């Protein structure tokens, strides 16, 4: 059964501005494993990755009904399969998490559906 759905839409310009103003911004948002991946990227792809993780973590906390604040960015970890599909490896939710991240122009969007595990 679906127990939560969260969506986040973010302007990548805002993430880029935060990244320029605060050198430590990526480490504030990304877990150690996510940061390793971030460092392996460059240019526009690096910004898309950071903005995508921001948006996905926001969407997940909205699906949980808490928003960022009660749950920190490091309480959630999102990695990718060998085919590039994002998946959640760490979260306070114990069920199935369905995640989609999209980039278009200057926007990134993430959608998260939370589903109870079948017993």
UniProtKB/Swiss-Prot annotation:
Broad EC category: transferase
Alphabetically sorted, this entry's keywords are:
Cytoplasm, Fatty acid biosynthesis, Fatty acid metabolism, Lipid biosynthesis, Lipid metabolism, Magnesium, Metal-binding, Transferase
Q: Name one GO cellular component term.
A: cytoplasm
Q: Does the keyword Lipid biosynthesis apply?
A: yes
What domain of life?
Answer: Bacteria
Protein's UniProt keywords contain Metal-binding: yes
BP term (GO), one: fatty acid biosynthetic process
Looking up NCBIfam families in the UniProt record yields: acpS, pantethn_trn
What family, per the record?
Answer: Belongs to the P-Pant transferase superfamily. AcpS family.
The coding gene here is acpS
Question: Which parts of the sequence bind Mg(2+)?
Answer: 8, 58
The UniProt GO MF terms for this protein read: holo-[acyl-carrier-protein] synthase activity; magnesium ion binding
Q: What does this protein do?
A: Transfers the 4'-phosphopantetheine moiety from coenzyme A to a Ser of acyl-carrier-protein.
Could you tell me the EC number(s) of this protein? 2.7.8.7
Q: Where in the cell is it found?
A: Cytoplasm
Q: Which organism is it from?
A: Streptococcus suis (strain 05ZYH33)
Q: Which cofactor does it need?
A: Mg(2+)
The record's listing under Pfam families reads:
ACPS (PF01648)
State what protein this is by name.
Holo-[acyl-carrier-protein] synthase
Report the catalytic activity: apo-[ACP] + CoA = holo-[ACP] + adenosine 3',5'-bisphosphate + H(+)
């Amino acid at each position: 059964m679906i127990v939560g759905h969260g969506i986040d839409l973010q302007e990548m310009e805002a993430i880029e501005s935060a990244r320029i103003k605060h050198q430590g911004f990526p480490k504030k948002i990304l877990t150690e494993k996510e940061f390793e991946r971030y460092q392996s990227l460059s240019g526009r792809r690096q910004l898309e990755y950071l903005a995508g993780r921001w948006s996905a973590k926001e969407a997940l906390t909205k699906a949980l009904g808490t928003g960022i604040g009660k749950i920190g960015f490091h309480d959630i970890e999102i990695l990718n399969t060998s085919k590039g599909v994002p998946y959640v490896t760490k979260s306070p939710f114990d069920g199935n998490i369905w995640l989609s991240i999209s980039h278009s122009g200057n926007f990134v969007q993430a959608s998260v559906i939370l589903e109870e595990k079948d017993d």
